[in-house]
């Protein structure tokens, strides 16, 4: 008969080989997974590469955007290790050609040495996915439409507390908003309110059509589906808290920092003089179709933000709770003990 002889190593060598083999198994089972999963249970799970790479703040003019950008983004970039870039569009346009949109989204996506990136500028929403690229995180602030127009109207005449020595476009023109309305002036024309809807509607041609119901509905869809947080200018502290809670890699410590600012830095660009409109002016403006649509959008955005804020604070309404509240979920009944892995 045919016999197979198996030569075993000496007992000491066999024990050494067995120990080395067990160490290898331990390394593969426990060391390698740490690059992707840190912990289970009630603690957070962190994943390498999970940090957002791009945050886009397509800031609407006269909505406290300067306060937010300077007091939060430019103050926090060192502490949280991100880059800040301002997007400047020729002739202060807020819409771009399709070609420029494509160039922009590719440039931002490929600009790896400047990521993580916080980019801000006066530009209407641009859909990255339209060009086959992963979307960034979009954020924004909005303001009651007539208040925004009044702020812009008097800003052109009297400037603000941010760049005091700069002469504004209507400097020396002391006409009040009421007087402008009475003569149907250009600067107070209610069509000047048509701005927040186009900013959220996006780059489609119909978005710029003044009084377009289609633009309003598109703006609502974009706000809900494409934006992480859209706050309101008179609740900027709540907005900062929501951003810290949802994008901590960019905004960790932002609420505490905002609370530490003095009144001047916490409210940059206050228009130096504003005359409240009369009841007659309010009636005339509120009766226009443009105001009704812009106000509908504002109310929609405010209700959406309120809903998110209420959940984030568990109903307390305190900004601090949005940041400090523990996660309201955990993992359990995890099987097997050593996870299956696929390459």
Regions found by a protein language model. Name each.
Residues 56-60, 137, 227-235, 282-289:
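Conserved aromatic-histidine-acidic binding/catalytic patches
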Residues 43, 88-141, 147-257:
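PAPS-dependent sulfotransferase catalytic domain
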Residues 35-109, 113-114:
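Signal-peptide-cleavage-adjacent N-terminal segments of secreted and extracellular proteins
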Residues 81, 98, 162, 274-278:
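Catalytic cores of eukaryotic secretory-pathway lumenal/extracellular enzymes that build
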Residues 32-35, 76-79, 149, 153-157:
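Juxtamembrane interfacial secondary-structure elements that flank transmembrane helices
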Residues 2-40:
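N-terminal signal-anchor transmembrane helix specifying type II single-pass membrane topology
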Residues 195, 202-208, 218-219, 253-341:
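PAPS-dependent sulfotransferase catalytic core
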């Amino acid at each position: 008969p045919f016999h197979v002889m198996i030569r075993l190593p000496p007992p000491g060598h066999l024990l050494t080989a067995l120990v080395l083999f067990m160490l290898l198994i331990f390394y593969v089972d426990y060391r390698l997974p740490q690059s992707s999963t840190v912990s289970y249970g009630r603690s957070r799970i962190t994943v390498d590469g999970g940090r957002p790479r791009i945050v886009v703040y397509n800031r609407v003019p006269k909505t406290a955007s300067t306060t937010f950008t300077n007091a939060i983004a430019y103050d926090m970039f060192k502490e949280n290790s991100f880059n800040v870039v301002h997007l400047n569009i020729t002739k202060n346009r807020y819409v771009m050609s399709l070609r420029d949109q494509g160039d922009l989204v590719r440039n931002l996506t490929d600009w790896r040495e400047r990521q993580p990136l916080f980019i801000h500028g006066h530009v209407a929403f641009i859909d990255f996915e339209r060009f086959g690229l992963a979307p960034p995180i979009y954020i924004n602030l909005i303001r009651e439409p007539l208040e925004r127009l009044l702020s812009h109207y008097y800003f052109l005449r009297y400037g603000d507390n941010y760049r005091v020595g700069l002469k504004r476009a209507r400097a020396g023109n002391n006409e009040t908003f009421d007087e402008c309305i009475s003569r149907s002036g250009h600067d107070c024309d209610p069509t000047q309110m048509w701005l927040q809807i186009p900013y959220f509607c996006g780059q489609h041609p119909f978005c710029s059509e003044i009084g377009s119901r289609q633009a309003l509905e598109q703006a609502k869809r974009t706000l809900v589906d494409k934006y992480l947080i859209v706050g309101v200018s008179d609740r900027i502290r709540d907005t900062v808290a929501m951003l810290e809670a949802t994008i901590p890699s960019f905004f960790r410590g932002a609420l505490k920092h905002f609370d530490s600012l003095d009144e001047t830095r916490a409210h940059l660009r206050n228009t130096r003089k504003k005359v409240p409109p009369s009841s007659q002016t309010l009636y005339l403006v509120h009766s226009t179709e443009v105001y009704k649509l812009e106000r509908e959008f504002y109310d929609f955005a405010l209700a959406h933000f309120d809903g998110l804020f209420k959940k984030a604070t568990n109903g307390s309404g305190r900004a601090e709770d949005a940041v400090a509240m523990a996660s309201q979920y955990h993992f359990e009944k995890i099987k097997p003990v050593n996870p299956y892995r696929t390459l």
